[in-house]
Amino acid sequence: MALIEGVGDEVTVLFAVLACLLVLALAWVSTHTTESTDPQPQPPGTTTPAQPSEAMSASDSIREEAPGAESPSLRHRGPSAQPEPDTGVTASTPPDSPQEPLLLRLKFLNDSEQVARAWPQDTIGSLKRTQFPGQEQQVRLIYQGQLLGDDTQTLGSLHLPPNCVLHCHVSTRVGPPHPPCPPGSEPGPSGLEIGSLLLPLLLLLLLLLWYCQIQYRPFFPLTATLGLAGFTLLLSLLAFAMYRP
């Protein structure tokens, strides 16, 4: 007995396989679509300097004096004050006292310790690069229960005492850093989310196959039943991995 009246089983199976391939192709294409981003706004032009609000009005009020006249202020003007000679003694500021290096004890999760020597002006990022070259993004420093996440913060601003303990946590994996979103720009609208519909479609197809296997058991040999069971197990693991918190 054919699955569909008037249509051979080979044609039905062929169309089912083509439908599955089409769904997989659409899901693969949807994962490679790039999100369009809005262009960054151009920086506003520089404002022109403001023109002076008041003109020099004092020059208009000066009166011209006669050529032979002599100002009374010139008669009574005394000799100009002579500048005092420079004694040559300048107050010299005492030089800054040299800062002492900090001895830090880096303690790991396995209770092993490593002594690091740094300066107060060194930053958290430079300390990571010095002690853990190539693993800066995987190292987390913790001091008194507080995560030191700002790599630009200096050690002197933390007021670390001598021979203090910094707990180090080195993660095994780290994702690529996400660039910060520029101001004034918003993420563009996402494309067609076909990838999120793939799992429900596969579940619907799986339920249809199990229904056909139960209703038309003679058309499903042992190998087809085992393949259907394996596909069900694989799809269950995929769903668990996707929706696991």
Curated annotation (Swiss-Prot):
Gene3D superfamilies: Phosphatidylinositol 3-kinase Catalytic Subunit, Chain A, domain 1. Disruption phenotype: Strong increase in home cage locomotor activity during the dark phase (subjective day) of the light:dark (L:D) cycle. There were no changes in activity during the light period and in locomotor activity observed in other assays, e.g. novel open-field. The modification Phosphoserine is found at residues 73, 97, 126. Disulfide bonds: none annotated. Residues 102-175 form the Ubiquitin-like domain. The keyword Transmembrane applies. Residues 33-100 are annotated as: Disordered. Involved in sterol-regulated ubiquitination and degradation of HMG-CoA reductase HMGCR. Involved in positive regulation of AMPA-selective glutamate receptor GRIA2 recycling to the cell surface. Acts as a negative regulator of hepatocyte growth during regeneration. Expressed in adult brain; at protein level. Isoform 1 (lHOPS) is highly expressed in small intestine, stomach and epididymis. Isoform 2 (sHOPS) and iHOPS are abundantly expressed in brain, liver and adrenal gland. Keywords: Cell membrane, Cytoplasm, Cytoskeleton, Endosome, Membrane, Nucleus, Phosphoprotein, Postsynaptic cell membrane, Synapse, Transmembrane, Transmembrane helix. It is found in: Membrane; Postsynaptic cell membrane; Recycling endosome; Cytoplasm. This is Transmembrane and ubiquitin-like domain-containing protein 1. Residues 2-30 are annotated as: Required to release iHOPS from membranes. The chain crosses the membrane at residues 11-31, 194-214, 219-239. Induction: Up-regulated in regenerating liver. SMART domains: UBQ (SM00213). One of its GO terms (cellular component) is nucleolus. It comes from the Eukaryota. Its main location: membrane. Interacts with EEF1A1, CAMLG, GRIA2 and GRIP1. Interacts with NPM1 and CDKN2A; TMUB1 can enhance interaction between NPM1 and CDKN2A and is proposed to bridge the proteins; proposed to be mediated by iHOPS. Interacts with TUBG1. Interacts with ERLIN2 and AMFR; TMUB1 promotes the interaction of ERLIN2 with AMFR. One of its GO terms (biological process) is ERAD pathway. Pfam families: ubiquitin (PF00240). It is a multi-pass membrane protein. Isoform 2 seems to undergo a selective cleavage in the C-terminal region to release an additional cytoplasmic form.
